């Protein structure tokens, strides 16, 4: 069992586009550990790369984490004792510390131009040199001395001076003792005065009291650099937990360029339940609570969470498994609760305008409440409910009869339709049971037609398709007048063919 002193964890995304699903993946384990230990979970915005900032990205980060139930205890939005929580608002914090590193001999200014660095890389590649890092041309030089040599630029960057005896091993909460490759002289302050990730993350984590750093395994190679910065600045280093990377089904790293599911907003747009996605992300790196028991709420997960149980294998992000899990969550919801979730989704996504060509009316909402039990068992996503129920919300005269469904009706469909209309006209009790009993008696018992063939024309007439939610319950919801109007309209249509 890992030490349970109150931990301070953080997730630190960059607002450079749609939030990545990896942000939620890390935030899940950050929040779980903070909650498990009675600590705090912090959201920090790392916006030092000014060239890649995207408008609205920061707001989307707040919205998606809130939607997932992973809201932080401290953030730029809610504040906290360690404000500001945006790196761009902390620039005055970094520069004095960079100067301190220069004065102590742990860092140096570099005036090499981008052209010179590119040439260095090309020459090494041509010579098949194993060297990949900076060649320290500027080390020990003044600006005036460096200006006399080729490839000079007026505004310098600042680089770490990595010692020969740098310790490459460190302890990881998930992986035990880890050995990383030797780092090069990393830039820690850019020419524009902004710190790089490596400098800013160390400074911010220390000053915000972050004692448990949860991040992807791609940062293992950077950890020796970060530990050096902690050492040089005289600070205690945090504990590190390097999570396994999310992988596509072909085992490649999941990315927004190749996989739409890498976009965190995509799950909300598609109609996934946040609790299902959260549960799914948990299962990617943590064992189930019991054999065959995949569904687990967040509080239960928190109560048994320990870093020693996190998997180190590359979890495969298989949306098919998420679809199954989301369907399980949908079917676990009470029909009234599910209806509210469906309507909230439809309102947020303006779905009715795409499905019906208009907004939902109050009458529509009442119909959806009544009809939700008919489709609950058939749903995988919230987005599927409205299209499945659209026939109940369509004007009788506007219902479109699917051509393929009409074409597949067997001979005698017109006779079935005539008989069904006459039976339904005489019904006073228009409940689902009464409708079924009357139609079965006339079409199956008297006319000798098999139920599947007998009810197919009725289904097409009422719903527009051969595939629909339960027919008789749908007819009850439509009511006698609307049902007969549709059936008579369809009767007239097939009479013309």
UniProtKB/Swiss-Prot annotation:
Question: Which positions does UniProt annotate for ATP binding?
Answer: 256
Which keywords does UniProt give here?
Answer: Aminoacyl-tRNA synthetase, ATP-binding, Cytoplasm, Ligase, Nucleotide-binding, Protein biosynthesis
User: Catalytic activity, per the record?
Assistant: tRNA(Glu) + L-glutamate + ATP = L-glutamyl-tRNA(Glu) + AMP + diphosphate
Its localization reads: Cytoplasm
User: Keyword Iron-sulfur on this protein?
Assistant: no
**Could you say which EC number(s) this protein's record lists?**
6.1.1.17
Domain of life, source organism: Bacteria
Q: Where is the motif ('KMSKS' region)?
A: 253-257
Q: Provide one Gene Ontology biological process annotation.
A: glutamyl-tRNA aminoacylation
One Pfam match, by short name?
tRNA-synt_1c
Keyword set includes Cell inner membrane: no
An example Gene Ontology CC term for this record: cytosol
Q: Which intervals of this chain are the motif 'HIGH' region? A: 13-23
One Gene Ontology term of the molecular function aspect: glutamate-tRNA ligase activity
Record InterPro entries: aa-tRNA-synth_I_cd-bd, aa-tRNA-synth_I_codon-bd_sub2, aa-tRNA-synth_I_CS, aa_tRNA-synth_I_cd-bd_sf, Glu-tRNA-ligase_bac/mito, Glu/Gln-tRNA-synth, Glu/Gln-tRNA-synth_Ib_cat-dom, GluQ/Sye
Q: Which family does it belong to?
A: Belongs to the class-I aminoacyl-tRNA synthetase family. Glutamate--tRNA ligase type 1 subfamily.
**Primary role:** Catalyzes the attachment of glutamate to tRNA(Glu) in a two-step reaction: glutamate is first activated by ATP to form Glu-AMP and then transferred to the acceptor end of tRNA(Glu).
Quaternary context: Monomer.
Identification of the protein by name: Glutamate--tRNA ligase
Q: Which organism is it from?
A: Cutibacterium acnes (strain DSM 16379 / KPA171202)
């Amino acid at each position: 069992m890992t030490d349970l002193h109150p931990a301070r964890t953080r997730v630190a995304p960059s607002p450079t586009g749609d939030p990545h699903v990896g942000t939620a993946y890390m935030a899940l384990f950050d929040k779980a550990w903070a909650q498990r230990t009675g600590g705090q979970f912090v959201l920090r915005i790392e916006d030092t790369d000014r060239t890649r900032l995207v408008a609205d990205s920061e707001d989307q980060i707040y919205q998606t984490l809130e939607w997932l139930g992973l809201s932080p205890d401290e953030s730029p939005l809610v504040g906290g004792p360690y404000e500001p929580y945006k790196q761009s608002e902390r620039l005055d914090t970094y520069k004095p510390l960079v100067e301190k590193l220069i004065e102590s001999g742990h860092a140096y200014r570099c005036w090499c131009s981008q052209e010179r660095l590119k040439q260095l890389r090309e020459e090494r590649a041509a010579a098949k040199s194993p060297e990949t890092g900076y060649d320290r041309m500027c080390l020990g030089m003044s600006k005036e001395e460096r200006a006399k040599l080729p490839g000079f630029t007026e505004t310098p960057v600042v680089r770490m001076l990595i010692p020969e005896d740098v310790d490459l091993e460190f302890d990881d909460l998930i992986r035990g003792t880890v050995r990383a490759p030797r780092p090069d002289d990393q830039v820690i302050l850019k020419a524009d005065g902004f710190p790089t990730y490596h400098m800013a993350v160390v400074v911010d984590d220390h000053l915000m009291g972050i004692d448990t750093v949860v991040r992807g395994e791609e940062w293992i190679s950077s950890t020796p650099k970060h530990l050096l910065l902690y050492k040089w600045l005289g600070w205690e280093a945090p504990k590190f937990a390097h999570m396994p990377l999310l992988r596509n089904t072909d085992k490649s790293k999941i990315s927004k360029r190749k996989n739409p599911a890498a976009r965190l907003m995509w799950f909300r747009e598609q109609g996934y339940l946040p609790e299902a996605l959260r549960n799914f992300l948990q299962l990617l790196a943590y064992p189930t609570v019991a054999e065959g028991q995949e569904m687990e709420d967040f509080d239960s997960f928190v109560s048994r969470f320990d870093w020693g149980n996190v998997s180190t294998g590359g979890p495969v992000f298989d949306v098919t498994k998420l679809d199954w899990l989301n369907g399980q969550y949908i079917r676990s919801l009470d029909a009234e609760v599910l209806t509210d979730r469906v309507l909230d989704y439809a309102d947020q996504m303006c779905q009715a305008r795409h499905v019906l060509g208009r907004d939902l009316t109050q009458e529509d909402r009442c119909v959806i409440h009544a009809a939700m039990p008919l489709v609950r068992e058939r749903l995988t996503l919230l987005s599927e409910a409205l299209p499945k129920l659209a026939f109940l919300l369509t004007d009788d005269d506007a219902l479109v009869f699917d051509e393929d469904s009409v074409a597949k009706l067997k001979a005698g469909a017109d006779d079935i339709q005539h008989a069904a209309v006459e039976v339904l006209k005489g019904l006073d009790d228009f409940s689902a049971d009464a409708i079924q009993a009357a139609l079965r008696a006339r079409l199956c018992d008297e006319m000798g037609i098999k139920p599947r063939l007998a009810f197919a024309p009725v289904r097409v007439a009422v719903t527009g398709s051969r595939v629909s939610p339960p027919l008789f319950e749908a007819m009850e919801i439509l009511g006698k007048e609307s049902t007969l109007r549709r059936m008579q309209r369809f009767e007239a249509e097939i009479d013309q063919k």
